[in-house]
């Protein structure tokens, strides 16, 4: 008699995805972030669900309801801070996951990669709408500034913004619909994650060398289940350290002031994980140009398979490309720093140079470096 996990229609899917899945024998800890992202998503959905039971999406009571959660609901404070800092953890894992994909050439699995880019956009949209819900000063002004960017779209821009707002400014209708979408999107993300995994399991995982590993595979369980459990333990420990010791470290003090449409905060800035894109947006004096650069800064990831000019898939044996990759990482860290600074000299010019360098590295320097390395192989 065959094992039930191999014969039962439902268990068979789980078995083929998590137990008997053939995996390369040499994948490093950089391959842990997929499972960590799954755990982050589960934490966010669970904490979000319990928060939604006590939250009210009305402009008059939203801020008060968040205060009520923190003060009066049993363990409400830990739910709130797990959810807020869980988002930061989510983005740390996301950036490392994407960085791993860029470094080791995982983008050559085009379907998996493209679904991943869509997932990135969906998570960013969800995080943005979630930031609006506490209805603090930065929530309100962040929502106003970012939604207002759509008015740069020619002809339909203004109508589009007012349609999203549900009026002539960010108000009750906006908050209610943002709550509805913020609740809905994680479930759409969960469905997309399954599609992402479906495409991944069609090809199997890549590995650090970038060489096909069909001849050297091991079962996912117990080798990678135990490895993923260790990764999860480290991440959850880091998250709990953040939540229990410095829960407001990554937040903005302005968001502890209730939203006031008559008083603009001196420095409007998004959460830290959007600062790199915000810096690119601000570095272009033209509104439409800024919006296009903002969207393209993420959308450019879709072009990665087309920009791959190397004869090798991974950067493991390509020292010049490695230099370009780490230059890109340094550039993104610079942009993140600039995004949190006021718009004044010397930050303006640093932001503009870093923005130009960002697109230059991806579109020009990396492909050229790869071609040079191809020629060096012949020596």
UniProtKB/Swiss-Prot annotation:
Names of required cofactors: heme b
Transmembrane segments: 33-53, 77-98, 113-133, 178-198, 226-246, 288-308, 320-340, 347-367
InterPro entries: Cyt_b/b6_C, Cyt_b/b6_C_sf, Cyt_b/b6_N, Cytb/b6-like_sf, Cytochrome_b, Cytochrome_b_C_euk/bac, Cytochrome_b_N_euk/bac, Di-haem_cyt_TM
Gene Ontology annotations for the cellular component aspect, listed alphabetically: mitochondrial inner membrane; respiratory chain complex III
Membrane topology: Multi-pass membrane protein
GO biological process, one term: mitochondrial electron transport, ubiquinol to cytochrome c
Cellular compartment(s): Mitochondrion inner membrane
Residues binding a ubiquinone, per UniProt: 201
SUPFAM superfamilies named among the record's database cross-references: a domain/subunit of cytochrome bc1 complex (Ubiquinol-cytochrome c reductase), Transmembrane di-heme cytochromes
CDD domains membership: cytochrome_b_C, Cytochrome_b_N
Major localization listed first in the record, in broad terms: mitochondrion
Note on cofactor: Binds 2 heme b groups non-covalently.
GO terms of molecular function: metal ion binding; ubiquinol-cytochrome-c reductase activity
Positions with a binding annotation for heme b b562: 83, 182
Keywords: Electron transport, Heme, Iron, Membrane, Metal-binding, Mitochondrion, Mitochondrion inner membrane, Respiratory chain, Transmembrane, Transmembrane helix, Transport, Ubiquinone
List of residues binding heme b b566: 97, 196
UniProt record similarity statement: Belongs to the cytochrome b family.
Subunit structure: The cytochrome bc1 complex contains 11 subunits: 3 respiratory subunits (MT-CYB, CYC1 and UQCRFS1), 2 core proteins (UQCRC1 and UQCRC2) and 6 low-molecular weight proteins (UQCRH/QCR6, UQCRB/QCR7, UQCRQ/QCR8, UQCR10/QCR9, UQCR11/QCR10 and a cleavage product of UQCRFS1). This cytochrome bc1 complex then forms a dimer.
Function: Component of the ubiquinol-cytochrome c reductase complex (complex III or cytochrome b-c1 complex) that is part of the mitochondrial respiratory chain. The b-c1 complex mediates electron transfer from ubiquinol to cytochrome c. Contributes to the generation of a proton gradient across the mitochondrial membrane that is then used for ATP synthesis.
Further remarks about this protein from its record: Heme 1 (or BL or b562) is low-potential and absorbs at about 562 nm, and heme 2 (or BH or b566) is high-potential and absorbs at about 566 nm.
Protein name per Swiss-Prot or TrEMBL: Cytochrome b
Organism expressing this protein natively: Pteropus dasymallus (Ryukyu flying fox)
């Amino acid at each position: 008699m065959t094992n039930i996990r191999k014969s039962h229609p439902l268990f068979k899917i789980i078995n083929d995805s998590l137990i008997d899945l053939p995996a390369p024998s040499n994948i490093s800890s950089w391959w842990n972030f997929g499972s960590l992202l799954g755990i982050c998503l589960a934490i966010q959905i669970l904490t979000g669900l319990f928060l939604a039971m006590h939250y009210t999406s009305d402009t008059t009571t939203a801020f008060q309801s968040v205060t009520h959660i923190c003060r009066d609901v049993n363990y409400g404070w830990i739910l709130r801070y797990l959810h807020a800092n869980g988002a930061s953890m989510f983005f740390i894992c996301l950036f490392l996951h994407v960085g791993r994909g860029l470094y080791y050439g995982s983008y050559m699995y085009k379907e998996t990669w493209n679904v991943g880019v869509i997932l990135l956009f969906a998570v960013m949209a969800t995080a943005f709408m979630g930031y609006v819900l506490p209805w603090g000063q930065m929530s309100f002004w962040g929502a106003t500034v970012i939604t207002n960017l759509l008015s740069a779209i020619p002809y339909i821009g203004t109508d589009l913004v007012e349609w999203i707002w549900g009026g002539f400014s960010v108000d009750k209708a906006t908050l209610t619909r943002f709550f509805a979408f913020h609740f809905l999107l994680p479930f759409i993300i969960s469905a997309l994650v399954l599609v992402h995994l479906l495409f991944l399991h069609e090809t199997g995982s890549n590995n650090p060398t970038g060489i096909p590993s069909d001849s050297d595979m091991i079962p996912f369980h117990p080798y990678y289940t135990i490895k993923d459990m260790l990764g999860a333990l480290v991440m959850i420990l880091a998250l709990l350290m953040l939540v229990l010791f410095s829960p407001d470290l990554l937040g903005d003090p302005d968001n502890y002031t209730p939203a006031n449409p008559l008083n603009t905060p001196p420095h409007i800035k998004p959460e830290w994980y959007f600062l790199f894109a915000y810096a690119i947006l601000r570095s272009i004096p033209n509104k439409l140009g800024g919006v296009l650069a903002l969207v393209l800064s993420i959308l450019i990831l879709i072009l990665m398979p087309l920009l791959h000019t190397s004869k090798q898939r991974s950067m493991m044996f390509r020292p010049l490309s490695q230099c370009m990759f780490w230059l890109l990482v340094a550039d993104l860290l610079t942009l993140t720093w600039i995004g949190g600074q006021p718009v004044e000299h010397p930050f303006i010019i640093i932001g503009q140079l870093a923005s130009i360098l960002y697109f230059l590295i991806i579109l020009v320097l990396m492909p050229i470096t790869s071609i040079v390395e191809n020629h060096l192989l012949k020596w």
